[in-house]
């Protein structure tokens, strides 16, 4: 998690500085109220009206790991059940965002996932509200390749959830089996 410069990548409402603490809350799965809050904070900040942000593909990696952990303890932990239900819906939304635009003309994604956090694409090290506002208002804030990469790599993370979806489809729980089968966008 420390390899991602969270404080230097954009979200819907600013920077992703607080994401590591939210991921820890979700990973620990100890308090349902805290888990719900953390999930909302992250998901509301990585997708807004079908727009994905710089933080989205990176957050998706950690949400996928949390999802996998939650699936492994489903029906044993109230938080795990909630996380699986919530993230199934959210992952489908992310897949829809990608697929809705993928048939249109678009640039090539950056060659490597890690290219998205090259220095030239990051916000300044120090937070400056005025500087960030100017950054957001600039229509050339993100190169076309970087911007498309937010969608492309986020979808790749969702696609990597296939084994967990199969596990849910084959579960003894009819609820989880049906829910996973409804996830049709992969």
Model-derived regions, located:
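Core helices of alpha-solenoid repeat scaffolds
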Residues: 15-20, 55-60, 154-162
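HEAT/HEAT-like alpha-solenoid repeats
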Residues: 20-32, 61-73, 166, 170
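N-terminal "cap/leader" segments of large eukaryotic alpha-helical scaffolds
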Residues: 1-37
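Acidic, serine/threonine- and proline-enriched intrinsically disordered linkers and terminal tails
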Residues: 88-165
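HEAT-repeat alpha-solenoid elements in large eukaryotic scaffold proteins
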Residues: 32-45, 88-91
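Residue-level signature of the C-terminal ends
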Residues: 45-49, 66, 70, 93-101, ...
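Eukaryotic acidic, Ser/Thr-rich intrinsically disordered low-complexity regions
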Residues: 2, 148, 162-186
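Residue-level detector of extended alpha-helical repeat arrays and alpha-solenoid scaffolds
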Residues: 35, 56, 77-80, 84, ...
